[in-house]
């Protein structure tokens, strides 16, 4: 459990860094908090991954990519 928590925190920190660097470079146009955006993106990936592993047909590769791309667009280019 501790290793999982550490990995999740590291993933979050790296995602926040990427989001903030993208905003500073003018690549992203969001107004929300980068920390919150990172948690929402991670939560989406974890949820989609669970559905994918369960073999839910609606979550095959194309759908997984579509939903992730859609959320990234909504979060980072708002």
Kindly give the residue locations of the regions a language model identified:
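Short secondary-structure transition hinges
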Residues: 1-16
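C-terminal peripheral helix-coil segments that are non-catalytic and often amphipathic
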Residues: 12-25, 35, 42-44, 50, ...
């Amino acid at each position: 459990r501790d290793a999982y928590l550490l990995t999740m925190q590291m993933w979050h920190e790296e995602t926040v860094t990427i989001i903030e660097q993208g905003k500073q470079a003018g690549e992203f146009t969001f107004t929300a908090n980068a920390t919150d955006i990172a948690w929402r993106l991670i939560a989406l990936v974890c949820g989609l991954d669970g559905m994918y592993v369960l073999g839910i047909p609606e979550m095959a590769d194309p759908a997984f990519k579509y939903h992730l791309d859609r959320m990234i667009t909504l979060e980072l280019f708002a």
